[in-house]
């Protein structure tokens, strides 16, 4: 699959979707994107910057949601203009899609909306690549139905069907907890869509702090290594210059000054894994 200006798949190095959870300010966004660009260029990692203009799914009505669509999209546009990076952001309603698609290179659907057929259809008809997040409540094999919905809508609109990714971000495990089943990554390959692993939301503790979500960022490297060893097309990670001061999802964000070391390990592992054949089908 061609994504932005690079090829993605299990026969290619993993690509990275990374950035802050939410757009907090223009300067911090440009600085964070610039630092990530430097790291990824050094390691030859294809990179898409991500951040949200609005966090519609919040634990509390008093939680910070963002700078608003107009200002958030303007800032993401500056990332493209100043740094030459492709950008991704999530959309939350059908009404937002046209305006968002006019700015960003890749759309993302929130996990909780993966079963909303009209919403998935509308995103697919945008003409943009779409990173479709698997709901925390969904079995991995059920993502085939979601991807098929997107492909059907694209085909009916006369657009390419080869623009959709399936993203794993953990599954609910009791109250206020998520777990990641690495078998899901292999199962989701059966969608014939590139599989992306979200290593930071997978360590989230949803609503775990009462009015906000907690997280266990110390396990991000553990799950990221496991996903790369399993074999993925891409990784998704949120980062922040100072996670303790992040306005959204700080507890599961990777400190920006640790991203380089983490990615260096993951690149080495990815190269070793993809030099050898995947044996899953040989065991049937």
UniProtKB/Swiss-Prot annotation:
UniProt keyword Cytoplasm present: yes
Enzyme class label: transferase
Pfam assignment, any one: DAHP_synth_1
GO cellular component, one term: cytoplasm
Pathway assigned to this chain's UniProt record: Carbohydrate biosynthesis; 3-deoxy-D-manno-octulosonate biosynthesis; 3-deoxy-D-manno-octulosonate from D-ribulose 5-phosphate: step 2/3; Bacterial outer membrane biogenesis; lipopolysaccharide biosynthesis
Location of this chain's protein in the cell: Cytoplasm
Domain of life: Bacteria
Coarse class of the protein's main subcellular location: cytoplasm
Gene Ontology process terms (BP): keto-3-deoxy-D-manno-octulosonic acid biosynthetic process
Reactions that this protein is recorded to catalyse: D-arabinose 5-phosphate + phosphoenolpyruvate + H2O = 3-deoxy-alpha-D-manno-2-octulosonate-8-phosphate + phosphate
Gene3D superfamilies reported in the protein's UniProt record: Aldolase class I (3.20.20.70)
HAMAP family attached to this UniProt entry: KDO8P_synth
Family stated for the protein in its record: Belongs to the KdsA family.
Name used for this protein in its record: 2-dehydro-3-deoxyphosphooctonate aldolase
Organism field: Burkholderia cenocepacia (strain HI2424)
